[in-house]
């Protein structure tokens, strides 16, 4: 079974937080190109910035037949999948068909966690919504470790921010 990561999971240090029982190595994060999806800033998570609760906006994916995205796939066990489901409880677990993966021949489909619940999808102009600058840094740091084509695929989301960026340390509330 493979997990597809399209945001902070492209950063090995961040991904390691999801895998407490094994040490991830660089080669565990396999770059993949997937047809039929695009990356968007619209996933709401309640976060705390210096004692202030706000809606943090994080990366999400959505279906788009005319697009493709890069991300990483990580081979996971059934036990790791169960732990991930708990950690990603606000997300829907979706299946990405192995045929959608352009640059790898796979035996299995991939799973991914994406926001699909209406109340967890941010609308442009919605109040009290901020993209944490630290999250942007985490994703950018991870992207640096991959090919130019991989990096270029993230270019658009790093230049068009639909919500205000908020500096500082945050925690999930």
How would you label these PLM feature ranges?
Residues 1-173:
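A glycine-rich, hydrophobic/aromatic-adjacent loop/helix-cap motif
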């Amino acid at each position: 079974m493979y997990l597809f990561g399209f945001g902070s999971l492209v950063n090995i240090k961040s991904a390691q937080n999801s895998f407490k029982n094994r040490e991830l190595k660089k080669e565990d994060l396999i770059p993949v190109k997937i047809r039929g999806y695009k990356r968007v800033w619209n996933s709401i998570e309640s976060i705390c910035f210096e004692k202030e609760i706000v809606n943090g906006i994080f990366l999400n994916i959505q279906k788009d037949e005319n697009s493709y995205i890069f991300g990483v796939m990580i081979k996971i066990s059934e036990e790791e999948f169960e732990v991930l489901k708990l950690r990603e409880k606000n997300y829907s677990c979706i299946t990405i068909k192995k045929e959608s993966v352009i640059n790898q021949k796979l035996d299995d489909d991939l799973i991914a966690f994406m926001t699909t619940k209406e109340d967890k999808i941010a609308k442009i102009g919605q109040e009290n919504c901020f993209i944490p600058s630290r999250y942007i840094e985490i994703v950018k740091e991870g992207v640096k470790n991959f090919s130019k084509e991989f990096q270029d695929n993230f270019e658009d989301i790093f230049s068009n921010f639909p919500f205000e960026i908020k500096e500082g340390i945050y925690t999930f509330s």
